[in-house]
Amino acid sequence: TISPRGIDIVQLGGASDCPTVQNFIFVADVSRFVFAFGCNDYSSTVQDPMLIRWSDQESVTNWTPAATNQAGSIRLSHGSEIITCVQTRQEIVVFTDSALYSLQYQGSPVVWSSQLLGDNTSIIGPNAAVAASGVIYWMGVEKFYKYDGRTQTMRCDLLRHIFQDINLAQASQVFAGTNEGFNEVWWFYCSASSTNIDLYVIYNYSEDVWSYGTLGRTAWLDSGLRNHPLAATYSYNLVDHEQGNDDNVSGTPVAISALIGSAEFDIDDGDHFGFVYRMLPDITFRGSDAASPQVTMTLIPMQNSGSGYNNPISAGGNSTATVTRTSTSVIEQFTGQVYVRVRGRQMIIQIESNQLGCAWQLGSPRIDIKQDGRRGNT
């Protein structure tokens, strides 16, 4: 049994009009105020989910507004409840279930003022927002947002992948974290069939790139003064991220499965079939611990966009050999080029690895492709 170490502030000497119920408490370390969000009003025990109160500056006990102190309150109007807040250098950004507000310190007599930053927004849970490099990012119910002085909906290539496989009944478990060493924001969430966190999505705000994967984490703390980000697991371990090349959460190294794929590409907007006969992978294995690191590169053709992957017969007399359904090549440390025979109207490239100690970086792969018959040819 863990004994609580917290102290009810109403029991402290000099306590005055302290909130007795609230959605959450927030300490503004820059301005040195204590805030109660979604709390009861003065001389009342009824909770108001849209009310914000703050104590006198540098006081945790004095919540009674007076001409001689800076305690006060403000009620927000857009939304039905306050969900969370995020502090930046200039303001405290407050999220309701349908709007975004800014709280800014004004000094006496107003003390704190509110400004509506955006309406008709959403946030999926109380821990789904985070600040990185002066910008606030958060996961909404069906989309992602950011605030950099103005509220914006973010472009996300993975919206369908994420929101068609998420357990909204467990939305309160969603949490965000930063990995500023790699210019990333992470969100962890439960898949549609799980009540525990098992998926993540990453946004790289420097490159405007999204990625995703499977991982069970219950808490996340960026590196800060440490060398690596720290995360908590369901097996009650604290693990360093971005250290080493393998998954060592259990004490036994396990290879990390990695995969990246391109969008579909074609020639002449798909008016012609393309025949690929050579690829230059442009992959380096700098940082690998494996003696012979390698990845698998796969070229996958399609006869028509949306038709699925298939094996059309080569047309136009350009190929006298069997054209494979897909072309899979092992890329090793000194592989400069690989020869293939693949034909399709659209194609994608995939690179994947599942090897202990393997680390790799993808540059700008190139392919040699030529026309091989027009639309409708067989």
Residue ranges and their predicted role:
Residues 1-35, 40-45, 62-66, 76, ...:
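Polar, enzyme-active/binding microenvironments
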Residues 2-7, 85, 279, 365:
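Generic beta-strand hydrophobic packing signal
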Residues 5-174:
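Beta-propeller and closely related beta-pinwheel folds
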Residues 120-135, 141-378:
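Beta-sheet repeat architectures centered on beta-propellers
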